[in-house]
Amino acid sequence: ILNRCCNDDN
């Protein structure tokens, strides 16, 4: 998990 901005829906 790296810099995930908006889509944490992955």
From Swiss-Prot:
GO terms for molecular function: toxin activity. It is found in: Secreted. Keywords: Secreted, Toxin. The keyword Secreted applies. GO terms for cellular component: extracellular region. Expressed by the venom gland. This is Toxin To33. It comes from Tityus obscurus.
